Amino acid sequence: MAKGKDVRIRVILECNSCVRNDLNKESPGISRYITQKNRHNTPSRLELRKFCPYCYKHTIHGEIKK
């Protein structure tokens, strides 16, 4: 018996430094992760520090729109 919108939604996290480097064509790709967040606990955009295989280091991954 779901009421309206679900509380937990699927979000896509994208590497912020790869996005900046992609404009200059320095990066071979853009790292993306798929995760879930609780809409009530975190109404703002999610930012997590995750490993980027293209930058070879841990970077900030921010939530993007679908």
From Swiss-Prot:
Record keywords, A-Z: Chloroplast, Plastid, Ribonucleoprotein, Ribosomal protein
Pfam short name (any one): Ribosomal_L33
Location of this chain's protein in the cell: Plastid, Chloroplast
GO molecular function: structural constituent of ribosome
Entry-linked PROSITE patterns: RIBOSOMAL_L33 (PS00582)
Gene Ontology BP annotations: translation
Entries under HAMAP family matching the protein: Ribosomal_bL33
Protein family per UniProt: Belongs to the bacterial ribosomal protein bL33 family.
PANTHER family: 50S RIBOSOMAL PROTEIN L33, CHLOROPLASTIC, LARGE RIBOSOMAL SUBUNIT PROTEIN BL33C
Protein's recorded name: Large ribosomal subunit protein bL33c
Protein's organism: Nandina domestica (Heavenly bamboo)
Lineage summary: Eukaryota, Viridiplantae, Streptophyta, Embryophyta, Tracheophyta
Encoding gene (name): rpl33
